[in-house]
Curated annotation (Swiss-Prot):
Keywords: Chlorophyll, Chloroplast, Chromophore, Electron transport, Iron, Magnesium, Membrane, Metal-binding, Oxidoreductase, Photosynthesis, Photosystem II, Plastid, Thylakoid, Transmembrane, Transmembrane helix, Transport. Chlorophyll a PD2 binds at residue 196. GO terms for cellular component: chloroplast thylakoid membrane; photosystem II. This is Photosystem II D2 protein. InterPro entries: D1/D2, Photo_II_D1/D2_sf, Photo_RC_L/M, Photo_RC_L/M_CS, PSII_PsbD/D2. Fe cation binds at residues 213, 267. PROSITE patterns: REACTION_CENTER (PS00244).
Length: 351
């Protein structure tokens, strides 16, 4: 008889931390959680602080701000002034010099939220990838979430980096985002940009595919033993199908003449369309950051300048963009000291 005496492998600090992070608990932490949870907490907390405590001039907290009329649709964390350039505006930096009130006033909170928000989104993407690896799934959820990350980073970081300062990024708020969209249209003719068109096609196409798919599955559910189509008729561990792909295929073949006959191809297409739309939009925003022009029909502009009777969709678009610029520029770029005569500014409900 042979007796082998083995010595237990010593476990280092990394192994102990790895075990603790990946322990089975109600909310999985993981290595990605070290990036996700602090950054998400600070970004959300920073936004709530900026839209309540700071906008009330440091007199109200979260609850009392909303009780006394704070509107989350119009409140926003404003971008730094143009004079700040692309400084990261650290609280301890030369601009704020450790003064929290001064830091908030110069826009440090915006940079804080934008950077922590970006890293928080990346952490959430890594979280999906990490959990997928641990449970043996493919990483397509993480790949899909790269689309929203690309849009956020391109709009809030890449665009202002290509411009003069953080000032040209959108402020962090609902109404502020819509104002930024007007800015993109007036100064970049964004709606006539092919990357924007591909983005719209991807997002609306994804919504259409989602609606069609959900309705089709609901239409072709198998009945349970009581001849009823209830949600109780499904269990996650059942081996049989819960709806009829054959019936769905026949239905759409009659509607369109063609239909998906392969579930794998169908669901990949539902992944591909919106994610591609998000990525193309992000590419387009990077182009705007570099002031690349798209669909400027110079020949039409020249003819319109010579012939007052010449009018096309594009020449009307030029007038719209000029109106947006004259309306926004004076208040949106006060550092430029624009002065427009009263007769050229839009009045009333002109826009």
């Amino acid at each position: 008889m042979t007796i082998a005496i083995g010595q237990e492998k010593t476990r280092g600090g990394f192994d102990l931390v790895d075990d603790w992070l990946k322990r089975d608990r109600f909310v999985f932490v993981g290595w990605s959680g070290l990036l996700l949870f602090p950054c998400a907490y600070l970004a959300v907390g920073g936004w709530l602080t900026g839209t309540t405590f700071v906008t009330s001039w440091y007199t109200h907290g979260l609850a009392s701000s909303y009780l006394e009329g704070c509107n989350f649709l119009t409140a926003a964390v404003s971008t730094p002034a143009n004079s700040m350039g692309h400084s990261l505006l650290f609280l301890w930096g030369p601009e704020a010099q450790g003064d929290f009130t001064r830091w908030c006033q110069i826009g440090g909170l915006w940079a804080f939220i934008a950077l922590h928000g970006s890293f928080g989104l990346i952490g959430f993407c890594l979280r999906q990838f990490e959990i997928a690896r641990l449970v043996g799934l493919r990483p397509y959820n993480a790949i899909a979430f790269s689309g929203p990350i690309a849009v956020f980073v391109s709009v809030f970081l890449m665009y202002p980096l290509g411009q003069a300062s953080w000032f040209f990024a959108p402020s962090l708020g609902v109404a502020a985002i819509f104002r930024f969209l007007l800015f993109l249209q007036g100064f970049h003719n964004w709606t006539l940009n092919p990357f924007h068109m591909m983005g719209v096609a991807g997002i609306l196409g994804g919504a259409l595919l989602c609606a069609i798919h959900g309705a089709t599955v609901q239409n072709t559910l198998f009945e349970d033993g009581d001849a009823a189509d209830t949600f109780r008729a499904f269990t996650p561990t059942q081996s049989e199908e819960t709806y009829s792909m054959v019936t769905a295929n026949r239905f759409w073949s009659q509607i369109f003449g063609v239909a998906f006959s392969n579930k794998r191809w169908l669901h990949f297409f539902m992944l591909f369309v919106p994610v591609t739309g998000l990525w193309t939009s992000a590419f387009g925003i990077v182009g705007l950051a570099l002031n690349l022009r798209a669909y400027d029909f110079v020949s039409q502009e020249l003819r319109a300048a010579e012939d007052p009777e010449f009018e096309t969709f594009y020449t009307k678009n030029i007038l719209l963009n000029e109106g947006i610029r004259s309306w926004m520029a004076a208040q949106d770029q006060p550092h430029e000291n624009f002065i427009f005569p009263e007769e050229v500014l839009p009045r009333g409900n002109a826009l």
